[in-house]
A protein has these predicted regions:
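Conserved alpha-helical segments that form or flank metal/cofactor-binding pockets of metalloenzymes
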Residues: 2-13, 75-103
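Internal, conserved structured core segments that host functional sites
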Residues: 110-159
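A contiguous pocket-lining binding segment that forms or flanks enzyme active sites
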Residues: 138-195
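Extended, helix-rich structural scaffolds rather than catalytic motifs
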Residues: 179-238
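Short, extreme N-terminal leader segments that mark the start of a protein/domain
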Residues: 1-68, 72
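Helix-loop segments that flank and shape redox-cofactor active sites
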Residues: 52-73, 114, 130-145
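Acidic/His metal-coordination segments adjacent to aromatic residues that form catalytic metal sites
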Residues: 23-43, 102-126
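Alpha-helical scaffold segments that form or flank carboxylate-/histidine-based iron centers
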Residues: 36-42, 66-81, 119-122, 147-161, ...
Length: 238
C-alpha cells in the first residue's frame, strides 16, 4: 500500500510529474466523479481558508514597503470575503466551527510546512498554494449537487488575490534577480506539500486502497499543469 503522507514533498511531486503511459478510462478517477458531502467539503475548504488568512496577515506584517502592505491588505480582504461567503453555503443549522474542527489541525500543520523563511517565500507560498488549492476544490466540487457546486464555484472564482501577489513577486525579482533561483526551488517544494494536502482531502490520513494513488494522479496532473503556467508567467521554472 502507498502512504503519501510518509513521503517527502519531492517524492510526491516526482510521482505526479513523471512520464507515464495513458491510464485506461475505467481506471482513471476524475475529481468531478467523486461525491463529497457538502458539510465535509466546506469544512475542509474553510479550515484551509482560515490558515490562508493567518498567512496573509503575517505577510502584511512582514511586508518591506508601504505599497506591498497595501497590496497584501487587499489580498487579505479578498480571502476574508471568500471565507465569509463559503460559511454562508454550509447546510442550514451547521456550526462552522464544528464543520472545520476535524480538518483544522491538519490545515495548521500544512500552513507551518509552507510558511517560508522570509517575506518573499511567504508571498510565493500564498500564490502557489492558493492557486493549486482553488483549482483542486473547483474540480473536487464538481461532484456536489448542481446548485451547491455552482454556488461554490462562483465564490472560488469570482475574485482572487493572485494578481496582487504576482505584482509583488515580479517587483521583488526585478529588484533582485538572484531571488529567482531560490523562488523556483521553493515553488517546487510547495507543489509537493500542497499535492499531499489535496490527496488527504480526498482520502483522509489513512492508507489508500491499492491503486488509489495511481488512479488519482492523472486528475492532479491537470492541476499541476495550471500551476506550471502560473510559474512560467513569473519567469520561474516549475
Amino acid at each position: 500500500m502507498v502512504r503519501w503522507f510518509d513521503r517527502t514533498p519531492r517524492e510526491v511531486t516526482r510521482s505526479l510529474l513523471r512520464a507515464r503511459t495513458v491510464v485506461a478510462e475505467g481506471d482513471r478517477v476524475l475529481l468531478q466523479d467523486l461525491e463529497p458531502r457538502l458539510d465535509q467539503y466546506l469544512g475542509q475548504l474553510l479550515a484551509l481558508q482560515l490558515v490562508v488568512l493567518q498567512q496573509a496577515g503575517q505577510a502584511v506584517k512582514d511586508a518591506p514597503t508601504l505599497a506591498a502592505k497595501a497590496n497584501l491588505v487587499e489580498a487579505l480582504r479578498i480571502v476574508s470575503t471568500r471565507y465569509r461567503d463559503l460559511v454562508r453555503l454550509l447546510p442550514r443549522d451547521t456550526d462552522p466551527l464544528g464543520a472545520m474542527e476535524p480538518f483544522y489541525a491538519s490545515s495548521e500543520r500544512f500552513a507551518k510546512e509552507v510558511a517560508g523563511v522570509d517575506w518573499y517565500e511567504q508571498v510565493l507560498s500564498l500564490h502557489v498554494t492558493t492557486g493549486l488549492l482553488t483549482d483542486f476544490f473547483v474540480a473536487y466540487g464538481g461532484g456536489l449537487p448542481d446548485d451547491d457546486r455552482d454556488a461554490v464555484v462562483r465564490v472560488l472564482t469570482r475574485e482572487t488575490g493572485q494578481p496582487l501577489l504576482v505584482e509583488e513577486l515580479q517587483r521583488a525579482i526585478v529588484a533582485n534577480p538572484r531571488l529567482a533561483a531560490r523562488m523556483a526551488l521553493w515553488g517546487r517544494r510547495l507543489v509537493g506539500d500542497t499535492l499531499l494536502q489535496m490527496y488527504l482531502a480526498v482520502h483522509g490520513p489513512a492508507d489508500a486502497a491499492p491503486g488509489a494513488t495511481r488512479r488519482l494522479e492523472p486528475a492532479f496532473n491537470d492541476i499541476v499543469a495550471a500551476h506550471t503556467r502560473r510559474m512560467d508567467a513569473l519567469g520561474l521554472t516549475a
